[in-house]
A protein has these predicted regions:
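Short acidic DE-rich linear segments
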Residues: 90-91
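Conserved SET/PR domain catalytic loop and adjacent active-site segment
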Residues: 4-7, 12-87
C-alpha cells in the first residue's frame, strides 16, 4: 500500500510522495486509477465538474470535468478562474 500525503482536512486531493503505478491500493481507502508521478496530485474523493480543488486547505483550482477518487489531478482536468475570496486578518 502507498501512503499519500494529505496536508489539510479540507483537502480533496493528496500528493504522491513517489511514483505510484496504476491500479495500486493507497491509503484513504482508494486505488490509483492512473499512473501518478512523484509530487503530483491524486483525487481522494469524487470531485464534480466545477467544484473547487483544495490543497493546503486553500482553493488551488477548479475541476473542468468529473474526477474520480484515485485519478491524477493535473492541467488536463483542472483549471483556474477568478472567484470571490474571503480574507481574515489577524491583528
Amino acid at each position: 500500500m502507498f501512503n499519500i500525503i494529505k496536508l489539510n482536512e479540507k483537502d480533496n486531493i493528496g500528493i504522491a510522495p513517489m511514483d505510484i503505478p496504476q491500479n495500486i491500493n493507497i491509503n484513504y481507502g482508494i486505488r490509483s486509477i492512473d499512473n501518478i508521478p512523484y509530487g503530483h496530485k491524486i483525487s481522494l474523493k469524487k470531485i464534480k465538474s466545477g467544484d473547487f480543488i483544495f490543497k493546503y486547505g486553500q482553493i488551488i483550482g477548479i475541476s473542468n470535468q468529473n474526477i474520480e477518487p484515485g485519478e491524477h489531478v493535473h492541467s488536463h482536468n483542472m483549471g483556474y478562474s477568478e472567484f470571490k475570496r474571503e480574507y481574515i486578518r489577524k491583528d
